[in-house]
Structures are given as C-alpha cells and as structure tokens.
C-alpha cells in the first residue's frame, strides 16, 4: 500500500511549556484584611462619638438658652436690673436708707414691696391701702403721729420716700414684737398683729408659742402671702447682697433684723 507522503510544510508542533506562570506579586503597601476591618470599625466608633458630641453640644446649648431665659424672667419678675457694679432694684437707695435707719434687712423690705405693689407708687387696693408698701389710712395716720410728721397727708403715700419710710417704721415695730421673725412679721403685716398673737397662743399652730413655720400657718391668703414674701426675701438676698454672708445667713434663718443691729445689741430696743 502506498505510504502517505509527508506534508511539504512540516507541521510545527508546539509543546506545552514546562514553565509555570508566576503568581501575582503581593502589593507591599496593601493592608492586611483584618487591619482594614479594624480601622473601619474604629472609624465608625469615632463617627458615633462625634455625633454624640455634637448632639450633647446642641443639648447643652439649648439648656443654657433655657436657663438664661428663666434667669431673665426671674430678674424681670423681681424688678432686678443687671449693671456693671452688680444688680440693683428700683428705689434701692431709699430702701437701703430706711432699712438701715430702722434696723431691717433691705432685702426683706424689697420683698414686702414686691408682693404689696410690685414697685408701683400709684398702687391702691380695693380696701384703700396705698402706695409701694400698701399702707392703710388709719395705720399711716398712727405712724405719722409716732414719728412726728405734722405735715402728713394720706396723699403723701403716693410719694416713694414717704411710703418706704412709713413702711419701714412699721416693719421695725412688728419686728420688735415678733423677734425679727420673717414669717411672723410678714404675717402680721398682712393680717395684723392681733391675729398673729392669737395664732402663737394656739398649740396646734405654734408648738413653742414663739415661732410658726410657714406650713403651719392657717390656710388662707396670709399663709400664701408669707410664703411669697419669705421666698422673695431669699431671692433678693442672693441677687442683691451675695457677698454679705453673715447677713445672708440671717436671711436663711428667717431673721429680718440687720446684722448691724444685732451686733450693736439694739435689735429689740
């Protein structure tokens, strides 16, 4: 049989290369997977902390604004004005002058004025009390006789100085009767000394016959009044006389007599 002839063009037989394809060379700058995940986790935590920080800042800013609004409302309610030399109130020079003359704490006088007239010289009640400290006609006339004011007229009580002078004299009178106790003096200023004396004799109201805590006062307008006055007293001490620690301590104890008077031994003259 004829043998097949070989192709004139010899076939090129390519043998498979015995060389292996080298593996991809690792990037020396590439972080390990575990480290990448760790950094990602830390970033998430950091973002959470930053978010919490800004939320807290926003919360604190809001609270600070609320606090400042409340503070300004308090100052306005108590007629306190802020200044470079500290806080002040309307008629403060007159209040301090006659408080000193009659051995009273000026903060207590201010508390009475705030709750009687809200610092209005033209205030007049339905029962005829008049002026800053709301003095009744018969009481004012009696005081005029005691201090020797021969020119007294009831219309003079619209005058701030006259009203504060008369009111401070009367507070001093009540202070001597009730040992400078803020609750008793404010109660007597509102309801009369006879009423307070009667309460002191009632063991159900006063356990010692000398003092009456506000919460033991009989329910009614006088109890509410005494509570407001004593609260205002403490606030005026804090706002107007924060550095007078000895006097402020007296206010905290409910004493309306000035520390100067106590030191001089004339509180109950």
Predicted regions and their residues:
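N-terminal targeting leaders characterized by basic, low-complexity, disordered sequences
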Residues: 1-21
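Intrinsically disordered, low-complexity regions enriched in Ser/Pro/Gly/Gln/His and often acidic
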Residues: 5, 27-30, 60, 192
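Short, intrinsically disordered low-complexity segments
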Residues: 2, 11, 29, 259-262
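Extracellular cell-wall/glycan-interacting regions and their flexible linkers
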Residues: 16-17, 21-22, 43, 48
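Catalytic glycan-binding domains that act on GlcNAc-containing polysaccharides
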Residues: 56-269
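Short, Lys/Arg-rich cytosolic juxtamembrane segment immediately N-terminal
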Residues: 22-35
